[in-house]
């Protein structure tokens, strides 16, 4: 299962699991709501983090701080789950390696 994270927008956080899109808007900071939101969506789908096979994250354009939050969470999850993390540059529409693939 591929998790796609988009924190580029100022007011909301969007994640997608195999093409199904989930969006949340809140007054909380993205750094405070992203992980609980991912957990909530996985629970609704009766999935766990262990079901993820790859993480893709929007690398821009967008809010610099928001993008940092998304990339940081993606890398932390990828590292802890030993799955690949890839960045998707929405401006160019191409997938690029963010930093590494855990081996």
Predicted stretch roles:
Residues 1-50, 83-103:
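Oxyanion-binding and handling regions
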Residues 28, 63-64:
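A generic secondary-structure micro-motif detector
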Residues 10, 60-61:
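Short glycine-rich anion-binding loops that position phosphate/pyrophosphate groups of nucleotides
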Residues 54, 58-59, 65-83:
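DPxDG-like acidic metal-binding loop motif
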């Amino acid at each position: 299962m591929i998790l796609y994270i988009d924190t580029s927008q100022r007011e909301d956080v969007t994640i997608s699991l195999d093409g199904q899109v989930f969006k949340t808007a809140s007054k909380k900071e993205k750094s405070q709501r992203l992980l609980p939101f991912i957990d909530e969506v996985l629970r609704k789908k009766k999935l766990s983090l262990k079901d993820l096979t790859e993480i893709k994250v929007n690398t821009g354009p967008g809010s610099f701080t928001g993008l940092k939050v998304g990339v940081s969470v993606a890398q932390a999850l990828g590292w802890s789950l030993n799955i690949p993390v890839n960045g998707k540059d929405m401006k160019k529409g191409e997938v690029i390696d963010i930093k590494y693939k855990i081996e």
